[in-house]
């Protein structure tokens, strides 16, 4: 029958402060995170952004203990999943593959090959699909498969998303219910679903299903909760000058306060593990914002981590994937068109060779301007918060 494996995919995070800059470099080197008109600009821009943002990011990681807990928690999830599968009589090895830090996806693939895995379930730890998260990891894996005959011999299947799994939504509702019950009148507390944002162009131009899956997930959690609480959905972690999915978390919180909301429970809907976006951005930045706006009671639902219902549902998901038809990389959602993650022009790029030459010259001037801004610490990118 052969050996069976599960590859858990995640973002990755710096284990210590010294890892922050190279982690950011890896992140911004990914064209699914920042798309540029010229690919040769990707690495220089990644170096600029990682160098200029490293100190601020290190300060944020210092506030949560000096590094991201994501690797530790993901490894705990992997061990819990493997143990639950074993309790069902399944001898399945679980591997961890991070996109931007150790253990890298390539390291996991090397272990999978060495262990002689013949059947593989590829399971991203992102409940909702986006071309910038699961899609980026799938693109990397597809490239590895195309270049490696040994990988091509593995019977694999991918799971694009699982936001509508009953065990997942029930586990989220259970944690939410526990937080609501800390209030004197639980049914009157406003529930604030905060999801990681993506550029609007991903959804409107590239066909990313992320927004629809986030909205569907919110509805399913409220259905599982079965309480009459008012609730809102917003998007956090926006960077750069382009428009992202709205409404923005940092704008909605003061709006709620101005409407008289005094009690708020935040649900990190797109995060299944504690990391910088929950521990620092929500717990510190948004809590302070809420208190300054007049919201006196602010609580946050913890991430699922190794919640028993969640792990049991992941285990069942793996077994269903093994029993069903295989799903290949070319069956996963892909961008419908090339999307540039910078302010869009009203005219098309590269209509003539002369235009291409001018585009190249403008790009070089832009790169020199970036270098000048890095040296002086002043410029438009600082004003919009990209640097």
UniProtKB/Swiss-Prot annotation:
Any one of the GO BP annotations: heme biosynthetic process
Thylakoid in keyword set: no
Binding site for Fe cation: 196, 277
EC number: 4.98.1.1
Pfam families, A to Z: Ferrochelatase (PF00762)
Task of the protein: Catalyzes the ferrous insertion into protoporphyrin IX.
A Gene Ontology term for the protein's cellular component: cytoplasm
Any GO molecular function: metal ion binding
Functional pathway: Porphyrin-containing compound metabolism; protoheme biosynthesis; protoheme from protoporphyrin-IX: step 1/1
Organism ancestry: Bacteria, Bacillati, Cyanobacteriota, Cyanophyceae, Gomontiellales
Compartment(s) where it occurs, according to its Swiss-Prot or TrEMBL record: Cytoplasm
Catalysis: reaction(s): heme b + 2 H(+) = protoporphyrin IX + Fe(2+)
Taxonomic source organism: Cyanothece sp. (strain PCC 7425 / ATCC 29141)
Taxonomic superkingdom: Bacteria
Protein family membership: Belongs to the ferrochelatase family.
UniProt keyword terms in alphabetical order: Cytoplasm, Heme biosynthesis, Iron, Lyase, Metal-binding, Porphyrin biosynthesis
Name this protein carries in UniProt: Ferrochelatase
Keyword Glycoprotein belongs to the record: no
